[in-house]
Amino acid sequence: MPRSVKKGPFVDGHLLSKVEKARESNSKRPIKTWSRRSMVLPQMVGLTIAIHNGRQHVPVLINENMVGHKLGEFAATRTYRGHAAGKKTK
């Protein structure tokens, strides 16, 4: 279920301040964050944000198509190595 329009998008305060600082200084360094629940805002477009997936920070370059989605959608938390191959007999 989507968030109420009157509440607006949720972004952690510390992440928003880091984004504003990076915008002011034209920094190209990735912004590390553990906040997977924060929504991608138009101010973040063009920045690289390193999103924590439980083990490491995955760098993600934010583009216009990502606006409105949650950061956690772009850093997979589970590794799938495929099903074990069946033993074939001749």
Curated annotation (Swiss-Prot):
Residues 1-30 are annotated as: Disordered. InterPro entries: Ribosomal_uS19, Ribosomal_uS19_bac-type, Ribosomal_uS19_CS, Ribosomal_uS19_SF. NCBIfam families: rpsS_bact (TIGR01050). This is Small ribosomal subunit protein uS19. GO terms for molecular function: rRNA binding; structural constituent of ribosome. GO terms for biological process: ribosomal small subunit assembly; translation. It comes from the Bacteria. Belongs to the universal ribosomal protein uS19 family. Residues 15-27 have a biased composition (Basic and acidic residues). The gene is rpsS. Keywords: Ribonucleoprotein, Ribosomal protein, RNA-binding, rRNA-binding. Pfam families: Ribosomal_S19. PANTHER family: RIBOSOMAL PROTEIN S19P FAMILY MEMBER (PTHR11880), SMALL RIBOSOMAL SUBUNIT PROTEIN US19M (PTHR11880:SF8). GO terms for cellular component: cytoplasm; small ribosomal subunit. Gene3D superfamilies: 30s Ribosomal Protein S19, Chain A.
